[in-house]
Amino acid sequence: MVRDTYGGAVDPLEPHPVTGQPSTSPAAPGGGWPGDPATPDTPVARTAVQVRRLAASAADVGELQARISVCRACPRLVRWRESVARDGRRAAFADQPYWGRPGPSFGDPDAEVLVVGLAPAANGTNRTGRMFTGDSSGDFLWAALHRTGFAALPTSVGAGDGQRLDGMRIVAAVRCAPPGNAPTGAERATCAPWLHRDLELSLPRLRTVLCLGGVAWTATLAAARALGWDVPRPAPRFGHAVEVPLRAPSGQVVRLLGCYHVSPHNTFTKRLTAPMLDAVLASLREPR
């Protein structure tokens, strides 16, 4: 066994499935994982107070994602994401290193569209290090993003595969994989400042926030209020293809757009179909 940056025991070096670069599980900051935004010197948030301070002081999208990717403020989530990376890997991925850290955003830092999901999956983003990558939810989403011209490739395998987004960036309401896909209220609140700063840094280019599911919708409305945006009251209810105009203090109007989440629960039951998702994504390109 070797030791990671924080002094914890980790698995020996294993080859990254895309690049072949040796990596530990979890991936050490600055240890060579492709696309890792952090370095060994990136400041680490260990409390909710530190999350607020480090989020607010991040100068740009890159610095913010680096700080997000090393956050350790929620002990339950840290234990879970790292235990999966070390001992709970799915059999199909048992010979692969796992990212095992919070999921940074992925996409265009100057995006006009911000896509907000719920949280990483234990064997998806927590394995690959990229939002909505490595599970069936991601497969459904990336195929649609490619069909509608946002994604360079129809699939997303993992960091280093050449995938890129044009005019779009993907974030999440909670950045760590939670047990049972269910973060607690306290964990959502601790993580919220990261989303707040993601919204701030997206202005003035931001035109639309696309929320995948009700949790993302609620988190985005809360973030907008915290930033002093003009948000309708009572709070607009989430629904598929529901649109709500939000106004930033600068006067800029940002469209909030709802979409059913791309989870298997919705796609297998046909609550969300490929044509439905394509229509929502196509509307992002319509002039406003």
Cite the ranges covered by each PLM segment.
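A polyanion-binding, active-site-adjacent surface
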Residues: 6, 13-246, 250-287
